[in-house]
Structures are given as C-alpha cells and as structure tokens.
Amino acid sequence: MKQDLFILAGPTAVGKTDISIKLAQKLNGEIISADSMQIYKHMDIGSAKITEAEKEGIPHHLIDFVSPFDEFSVAEFKEKSKNAIKDIASRGKLPMIVGGTGFYIDSLIFNYDFANTYKDEEYREHLKNLASEHGKEYVHELLKDIDEVSYKKLYPNDLKRVIRALEVFKLTGKTISEFNKEQDIFDIPYNVYYFVLNMDRSKLYERINKRVDIMMEKGLIEEVKSLQNMGCTPDMQSMKGIGYKEILYYLDGKLSLDEAVELIKKGSRHYAKRQLTWFRKDNRVNWIDKDQYKDDTEVCNAIEEKFLNLKNNL
C-alpha cells in the first residue's frame, strides 16, 4: 500500500506557515520543510524561518540543520525527506511537505533518479568551462536546436539544469522530457495530495514588500553582518539567497541601503512569479485561492475537506 503524502506549497509570503500549523493539528501531521534557505543554521530572519513558538508543538523536519559553509543538494534533500516520511508514518502521523522550493518537492513526487546513471563528468566540466568563458547564455543557446522545450522552460541562470538537459541528450539522444517519460516518472511510493496556495498578485506583492520591511526591522543587517564575521562570502550557496546577497553588497559598499532593500523586494516578487510558474506545470495540483475565503481557518477547512474527499475516492 502506498504511503499518503500531503503537500502544501505556494509562493513566498502567501502564508504557508500559519496554515500548515493549523492543518497539521487537524490532520495529525508532522511537517517536513521544503525550503532551500530554511535548511541553514544562523539564517533565521532572511529565510523567514519558523520560530519555536510559531510551531505550536508541531514537529518540524529539515529545518536549521546545515552549516552556511556547506552545500546541500536536491539528492540529499530527497534522501533525508524519504527517511523523515518513513519515520513520521511509523508513528501513525501524516507526513506533510510544506514549502516553496519546487525542485525539492518534485524530487519526491517524480521518479527522477539521475544520481548513479547517465552521467558524463567530462562533458559537464566542458560545459561549465564554456559558461565561464562565454557566459551562461552561450550554454543555454546550445539547447535551442536539440531541445526546444527545455530551452524555453529553463533560464540561462539555471545552469545546472541546462547542463543536465544537454548531458541527457548527449548520452541518450533523447530530450530530457522524452527521457523522463520513459522512466515512468509518476511511479512513486506515495499517494500525493498536492495543494498550492495563491492569491491576487497585487495583494501578494504587497505582502512581500511588507515582509521585507519586517525583516529589516527584525535585524536582517545584523544577521548578515554576523554571517560575514563568521567568514561567509557571496560565492557560497547559502549566501546567494534573496536578502542575503543584497545586504552583503550593502555591507561591502556596493549598494546603498535603499537600493539593497528595493532589490530584495524586487527579487522576492520575481521569485514568487517563478514559483507559481513552476507549480502550474504539475496537473496534480489542487489550487487554493485564499481570496475566496474569509480567513485562514476557512482556508484550512476547505483544504481538509478536499483532502478527505480525495482520500475517499482513491
């Protein structure tokens, strides 16, 4: 029998945290975070990490456990999440994936396993060198003639995935989407119940701007200063997150404070747009428009009802 897996996703600042706590209480669940910034220690304000008080006693997994000096891969997330899902289920609880990092979520609900197959390290290095010499756009353009779907879907900055698409074509003669279809990507050990929160874009952008102002008031500059004093630099994976890189540039005198704050807001709004685009590509998603409900309690009731109906109709 397949394990039930509940997913609550949505763009940054849409209000996932509060709703996830209410749902975990209703559904007897524990939360596995799918957030690529909340994994890091010492990075609480800029990642909007949930506090102990906000957890209201609900156990959380995969939060605050990676050093900002370390890299953390999607493969590692998948492995740790699978272990957490087993652990939660063994105690009779519902595993709940909550977050906005789409490729973390996809690693669990698609049957992607490239870790030990179809690799060509030499070709990867060659493409990385091309990107260093000629720019990421140059490597992205290589996709145009061989895999137009990936060319249109992937941004030049998403170099890892661009290289992966080129690598799969070189090794198999197939586009990555064709290759994935043949791998039976929906053959996973879970019954997936996937909900994505959304709201009117102007309201969401207002919430994002307000959230950034609150982060500044809470001491984001001091948090980044502390990380800088620890030895963190802009080239580290952890420091490339929105909010951290801009404040680092401010501290280094490359931006004024107003410029840094405006860039954080702008970057967060663009990120929210990309997140929504990502979630829209999965037809298993049940969209929840928060504007249709009076408050979070009503939102939770609607999600709970939909979840139970889906379970009963399996």
UniProtKB/Swiss-Prot annotation:
Its cofactor is Mg(2+). Keywords: ATP-binding, Magnesium, Nucleotide-binding, Transferase, tRNA processing. It is an enzyme of class 2 (transferase). The keyword ATP-binding applies. Substrate binds at residues 12-17. The record marks 101, 124 as: Interaction with substrate tRNA. It holds the Pfam family IPPT. InterPro entries: Dimethylallyltransferase (IPR039657), IPT (IPR018022), P-loop_NTPase (IPR027417). ATP binds at residues 10-17. One of its GO terms (molecular function) is tRNA dimethylallyltransferase activity. Residues 35-38 are annotated as: Interaction with substrate tRNA. The keyword Cell membrane does not apply. It comes from the Bacteria. Its EC number is 2.5.1.75. One of its GO terms (biological process) is tRNA modification. It catalyses: adenosine(37) in tRNA + dimethylallyl diphosphate = N(6)-dimethylallyladenosine(37) in tRNA + diphosphate. Monomer. Catalyzes the transfer of a dimethylallyl group onto the adenine at position 37 in tRNAs that read codons beginning with uridine, leading to the formation of N6-(dimethylallyl)adenosine (i(6)A). Belongs to the IPP transferase family. This is tRNA dimethylallyltransferase.
